[in-house]
Amino acid sequence: MNKAVSDLSSHTPMMQQYWRLKNQHPDQLMFYRMGDFYEIFYEDAKKAAKLLDITLTARGQSAGQAIPMCGIPYHAAEGYLAKLVKLGESVVICEQVGDPATSKGPVERQVVRIITPGTVSDEALLDERRDNLIAAVLGDERLFGLAVLDITSGNFTVLEIKGWENLLAELERVNPVELLIPDDWPKDLPAEKRRGVRRRAPWDFERDSALKSLCQQFSTQDLKGFGCETLTLAIGAAGCLLAYAKETQRTALPHLRSLRHERLDDTVVLDGASRRNLELDTNLAGGRDNTLQSVVDRCQTAMGSRLLTRWLNRPLRDLTVLLARQTSITCLLDRYRFENLQPQLKEIGDIERILARIGLRNARPRDLARLRDALGALPELQVAMTDLEAPHLQRLATTTSTYPELAALLEKAIIDNPPAVIRDGGVLKTGYDSELDELQSLSENAGQFLIDLEAREKARTGLANLKVGYNRIHGYFIELPSKQAESAPADYIRRQTLKGAERFITPELKEFEDKALSAKSRALAREKMLYEALLEDLISQLPPLQDTAGALAELDVLSNLAERALNLDLNCPTFVSEPCMRISQGRHPVVEQVLTTPFVANDLSLDDNTRMLVITGPNMGGKSTYMRQTALIVLLAHIGSFVPAASCELSLVDRIFTRIGSSDDLAGGRSTFMVEMSETANILHNATERSLVLMDEVGRGTSTFDGLSLAWAAAERLAQLRAYTLFATHYFELTVLPEAEPLVANVHLNATEHNERIVFLHHVLPGPASQSYGLAVAQLAGVPSEVIVRAREHLSRLEDTALPHEAPKPAAKGKPAAPQQSDMFASLPHPVLDELAKLDLDDVTPRRALEMLYALKNRI
């Protein structure tokens, strides 16, 4: 980025003005308005030209040096801004605020807005179905304060967290596009590995000033009403966020009305690895196809989709809330009531973000048109909601108000299909304001006046080729061919000479020009003033409007979950106080949708008698699917949704852990095995008897003995913790665990071979698997047949020559014992053993036997 320039004396007046503004924002790109373009200069220009793939050129000189520059048309800036924001850049918008006609020297310019990835609110720059969050964090390993703001909705939350692991897990859940941290934090902390990290001055996080600014924002004396007055660190982080939002928006933020105190104890905690492995809203490739959200989200509004995503990423342990949601879904399913609500909800649209843009005073005409349509649809929707007897739905209906006065105001003000922006006018209806109507009439009737004037002048002068016209540079004119110009009347005043023509003006035309041109500019100014006043009227009603938007978003989610329950054959889970997890005919909600054949449903039963299932079976047999479907069923239950199972009975869980699949962490310098062990360590340190743990192929990233030993010890530890555990493995030796751990049971995914090909049956059956079918899976994967044949030969030789052994028994506590290696990996017999096997001891003399013994000893 540009370095600050302190000596401005050698620069031109224009560049002096530029540097005075640029020096205040050295680390951000500056769009500097010059006429119809945003110009970008110096290092900003070099960077922007590369990022936007536009031409880098030069503009004159300043301080004796050519000025690198590039530019974009101001009316096309939105697309370029969107690209820069997606690349993580922040852009300072510097507009002309002075009048070029009256300015002496450079036109006055000001920074009117700073667009950053986390504070952008323009519809074109946002993903409509995902939250756009900015976060701030303060504190240290002992305790962190975290604040999260969605400026596009007004949602503002705070919480305090102990330890880096919990903080990083929460940041993974929130996934902010910008993260503000104190400038005095040490470098290379774990949080700095995230995208969009911005260091801010330590005083931005100061608790007392933060408390004061937050109370001013919410018009309260203190924060006791929000339940967060004791959260010193979180308040400091929230104050920094509020200051950053005001700095970037350069306006009041009336849509930020409250703080919500979140608590980890209220939620089912998922760490970052578990979120990725379960593919809640992003698949492992970074896309959105074949995720849980892609299956369960058929919301009618974008704000409903965003709320559902928040629910999926923050499952709850509050039984009161969960039961209220279940009852609501049951009510909406009764007589298919959701079918009547969903088309009406679609008419509401994304009023949550529209209201935020109104609060930021950058709402566009089409935003107001959509709000008008939404308010017009509210009365009918409210009537439909009165029939919903579930208590929670009744509360939502009470919160959903109608706004007949605002609806009438917008209906009177905004034309049916307004332009995208107010810049050129044409937004307000005729009849909304009499003064505006008069000015517009004068401007719009100019064409008829010119036609009439041309006809009169032709008749008066007898010059048939006379024309009356207008251009932006010279204004109105009367044009005559050069040959007829000498016949022009005396009151024709020469204005412009062209090749083959002369242009004139008359006192009458000049008088009309003054009125018409003045009327057009005054009409535009009047319309913009009326539009701003309309926004102020709407801002005064923001609190109830935002409450209505929140209620309708939740109604949309609940209606959506009712529709999904019907069409995906989901059933209501039952929460019980007895520790258990019993699922009958459970299905994987995502896999089921992509299969062309019927999904094989399976049961699961974990309780005080069985806390762990050791799952064996062939690759591709369905072990990972079975494990993941269990986690997704439990998660869906903890958002209040129905679940893909014939029945489900469970107690509340506190965490869901998954250790399924790994890859190298190249950026962090960690191997696949190191990633696997880090995830395993996290589980072993934090799992409780109320946690659900999925462990898939632990130990496969190292040698057989090491991997088996680690897997064995980890399984023992989880059994002792009494966590609900599904432990999938290819180490057949682990199937003896139930002999030492009474809470452990074996199950397997069955398969069979037919004509040397494997057939996966996908049924979960009691007991361990009989074999692994590895070669059959390799054949199915397309491994060349000659390789398969050779592998069978090796396998046969290994099985024939391996030393026989029994399945190992669990080591006694305190006595280290390496588990025996499985036959597949057994070492080849020593050649000495081959020699001994060939000996006919009955034909060997004692002397010959002694000689052979010495010879064999020398070969060992």
Swiss-Prot record:
InterPro entries in the record, alphabetically?
A: DNA_mismatch_repair_MutS, DNA_mismatch_repair_MutS-lik_N, DNA_mismatch_repair_MutS/MSH, DNA_mismatch_repair_MutS_C, DNA_mismatch_repair_MutS_clamp, DNA_mismatch_repair_MutS_core, DNA_mismatch_repair_MutS_N, DNA_mismatch_repair_MutS_sf
Q: What is an annotated GO biological process for this record, any one?
A: mismatch repair
UniProt-annotated stretches for the region Disordered: 800-823
Alphabetized, the UniProt keywords read: ATP-binding, DNA damage, DNA repair, DNA-binding, Nucleotide-binding
Checking Gene3D superfamilies in the record gives: 1.10.1420.10, 6.10.140.430, DNA repair protein MutS, domain I, MutS, connector domain, P-loop containing nucleotide triphosphate hydrolases
Compositional bias per record (Low complexity), positions renumbered to this chain:
809-819
Q: GO CC terms for this protein?
A: cytosol
- Nuclease: present as a keyword of the record? no
- Which amino acid positions bind ATP, per UniProt? 617-624
Q: Which GO terms describe its molecular function?
A: ATP binding; ATP-dependent DNA damage sensor activity; damaged DNA binding; mismatched DNA binding
Q: Which Pfam families match?
A: MutS_I, MutS_II, MutS_III, MutS_IV, MutS_V
Q: Which family does it belong to?
A: Belongs to the DNA mismatch repair MutS family.
Name the NCBIfam families for this protein: mutS1, PRK05399.1
Q: What does this protein do?
A: This protein is involved in the repair of mismatches in DNA. It is possible that it carries out the mismatch recognition step. This protein has a weak ATPase activity.
Q: Which PANTHER family match?
A: DNA MISMATCH REPAIR PROTEIN MSH1, MITOCHONDRIAL, DNA MISMATCH REPAIR PROTEIN MUTS FAMILY MEMBER
Q: What is this protein called?
A: DNA mismatch repair protein MutS
The gene from which this protein is expressed is mutS
